[in-house]
């Protein structure tokens, strides 16, 4: 029995945009579209011999709801099936050219069964958004000159239920919102929530590019979580993975019996490191699929930013491959020109349709102008992760403080390229897995020195130009390496050193948000000035951060466990400089050394300035000082 095809949702213009690769709203056209009488189904399977919808509503019979191919050569099969209701489970039964029958999940499904089950579910949202105030002001909160302190988390292992069960979107919403607000973060970044069959992939092996994972609840439950965060004034960034997809039989791989979403040649279509499939960005319909996925999360879920995973693997044809294992582009080079074109189209569409949103590239190479506009030849991302800063900083802090003077260039080098891109400074989940240990475990010395060292790293990070990203558990110094099984070690907060570290992060966030000098010119060299970058002997750095109106914050970093009294620094302004933050304060678990609230300048020239400060530098500590004249300025 054929499904009826009396009311196609696809116009000729839709088909044109689909074939051109520029359709960004396919989630309204393809997949399962419910109404009161049933559902319209449409699926792209150009090489199939036959396609049927099978599901709980027709006893999984492959002859009960047979779809018909459109007569326009688009490769889309469609039809209306009566009696389908929200929550019904279904799949496509696809007869391949060789006679094989594949049962596939719907690529455009907006809900799915809880893994390991693999069926799609019919869905229509009933959520009523209450985040109008956030959405109206989002462009300001998300601007490149605004503070970004991003709390990265894996939803399934942040907190668990008392019985150890996975949390629910709806249940965790008030806890998460209250936590990030209390500790001063401006945004959360959720590791991928698109449906994925293997929990241990953390969401990075996606099968459902339009479906929020059912492990934590329904799509409306996720909307409730995002709504709650927005109402608390917290932005939401979502990890999105257009770089590859898994080869699970129910997913996109060989969808209609042919290599439809991926390349047929394994040198182009198979990822040797991840054992996954690579999208064929040269196929326009695939680009429209991915573009629609990105816009779906922004429009239907009010996501404020997309962190695009593994961009480097998209840009290079030889990524993870040896000589002879890859196919050069038409010019003989290793650049993936189709992926470049797709990323530019993606960013063009996002910033055109959602100017208050940011796209953030996880890109680990020196590809030029990743976060520069399209009109100057860039890829068009809003920001890019600074992997060089992360590697150099962690390498420096791993060294015994006694020997850091021999590695001083590691900690100063990042400033030389800090303004080439719009950088995010990431201490992400990638640095606390696969045997790398925890952040606190990377610090040398005894327990006191480890906590002092991590406070110093965070102080340096929050003072350094660039937006901030910290993975959950780092804020209180979890000692165990992160695992997706179980929750964070919340119990360690009963210990003063862990609680003190979290208090330090909270105060860093507060100062960072309050002081324009610490965030307004993150991407402009006018916002940074060295006082002294060359004191390698003492492992001391000192610099100024500046706002547009000239307000300043002085930052001094002492990366050895030696108190340094009578340390002289030249400064640009005479008068009293208040010690706004000191990571060695007893409140944070430090020794209490410092400058009794601040220091008055003396007319002694130093470091190119006519006046100077004589300071006590606490051990393994970072100081933030603010001139008294700037304390009274509301826009400083």
Swiss-Prot record:
Keyword field: Carbohydrate metabolism, Glycogen biosynthesis, Glycogen metabolism, Glycosyltransferase, Transferase
Record-linked SUPFAM superfamilies: (Trans)glycosidases (SSF51445), E set domains (SSF81296), Glycosyl hydrolase domain (SSF51011)
Gene Ontology biological process terms from the UniProt entry: glycogen biosynthetic process
Highest rank taxon of the organism: Bacteria
Catalytic activity: Transfers a segment of a (1->4)-alpha-D-glucan chain to a primary hydroxy group in a similar glucan chain
Reported function: Catalyzes the formation of the alpha-1,6-glucosidic linkages in glycogen by scission of a 1,4-alpha-linked oligosaccharide from growing alpha-1,4-glucan chains and the subsequent attachment of the oligosaccharide to the alpha-1,6 position.
Protein name (Swiss-Prot/TrEMBL): 1,4-alpha-glucan branching enzyme GlgB
Species, as recorded: Aromatoleum aromaticum (strain DSM 19018 / LMG 30748 / EbN1)
């Amino acid at each position: 029995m054929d499904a009826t095809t009396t009311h196609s949702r696809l116009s000729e213009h839709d088909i044109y945009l689909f074939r051109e690769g520029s359709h960004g709203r396919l989630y309204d056209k393809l997949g399962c579209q419910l109404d009161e009488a049933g559902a319209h189904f449409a699926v792209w399977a150009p090489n199939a011999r036959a396609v049927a919808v099978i599901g709980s509503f027709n006893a999984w019979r492959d002859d009960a709801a047979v779809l018909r191919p459109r007569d326009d050569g688009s490769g889309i099969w469609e039809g209306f099936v009566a009696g389908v209701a929200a929550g019904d489970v279904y799949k496509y039964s696809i007869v391949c050219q060789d006679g094989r029958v594949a049962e596939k999940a719907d690529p455009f499904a907006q809900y799915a069964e809880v893994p390991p089950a693999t069926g799609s579910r019919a869905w229509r949202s009933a959520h009523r958004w209450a985040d109008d105030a956030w959405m109206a002001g989002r462009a300001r909160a998300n601007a490149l000159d605004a503070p970004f302190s991003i709390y990265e988390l894996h939803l399934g292992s942040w907190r668990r239920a008392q019985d150890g069960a996975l949390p629910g979107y709806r249940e965790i919403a008030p806890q998460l919102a209250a936590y990030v607000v209390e500790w001063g973060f401006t945004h959360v970044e959720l590791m991928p929530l698109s449906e994925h069959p293997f929990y241990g992939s953390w969401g990075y092996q996606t099968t459902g590019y339009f479906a929020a994972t059912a492990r934590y609840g329904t799509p409306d439950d996720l909307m409730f979580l995002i709504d709650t965060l927005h109402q608390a004034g917290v932005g939401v960034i979502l990890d999105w993975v257009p770089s590859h997809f898994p080869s699970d039989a129910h997913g996109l791989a060989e969808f209609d019996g042919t290599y439809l979403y991926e390349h047929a040649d394994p040198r182009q279509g198979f990822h040797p490191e991840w054992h996954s499939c690579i999208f064929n960005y040269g196929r326009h319909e695939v680009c429209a699929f991915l573009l629609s996925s990105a816009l779906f999360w922004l429009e239907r879920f009010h996501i404020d930013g997309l962190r695009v995973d593994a961009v480097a693997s998209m840009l290079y044809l030889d990524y993870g491959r040896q000589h002879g294992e890859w196919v050069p582009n038409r010019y003989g080079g290793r650049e993936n020109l189709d992926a470049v074109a797709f990323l530019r189209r993606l960013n063009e569409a996002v910033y055109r349709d959602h100017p208050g949103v940011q796209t953030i590239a996880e890109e680990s190479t020196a590809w030029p102008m990743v976060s520069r506009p399209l009109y100057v030849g860039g890829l068009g991302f809003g920001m890019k992760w600074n992997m060089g800063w992360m590697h150099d900083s962690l390498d420096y802090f791993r060294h015994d403080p006694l020997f850091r003077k021999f590695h001083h260039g590691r900690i100063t080098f990042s400033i030389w390229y800090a303004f080439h891109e719009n950088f995010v400074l990431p201490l992400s989940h990638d640095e606390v897995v696969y045997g790398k240990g925890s952040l606190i475990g990377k610090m040398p010395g005894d327990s006191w020195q480890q906590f002092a060292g991590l406070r110093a790293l965070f102080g340096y990070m929050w003072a350094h130009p660039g937006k901030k990203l910290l993975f959950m558990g780092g804020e209180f110094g979890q000692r165990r390496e992160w695992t997706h099984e179980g929750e964070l070690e919340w119990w360690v907060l009963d210990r003063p050193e862990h609680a003190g570290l979290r208090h330090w992060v909270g105060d860093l966030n507060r100062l960072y948000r309050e002081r324009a000098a610490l965030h307004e010119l993150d991407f402009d060299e006018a916002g940074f000035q060295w006082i002294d970058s060359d004191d390698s002997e003492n492992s001391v750095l000192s610099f100024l951060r500046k706002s547009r109106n000239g307000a300043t914050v002085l930052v001094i970093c002492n990366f050895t466990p030696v108190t340094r009294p009578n340390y002289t620094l030249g400064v640009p302004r005479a008068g009293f400089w208040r010690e706004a933050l000191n990571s060695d304060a007893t409140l944070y678990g430090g020794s209490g050394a410092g400058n009794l609230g601040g220091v008055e300048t003396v007319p002694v020239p130093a470091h190119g300035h006519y006046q100077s400060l004589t300071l006590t530098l606490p051990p393994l500590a970072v100081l933030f000082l603010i001139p008294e004249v700037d304390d009274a300025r509301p826009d400083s």
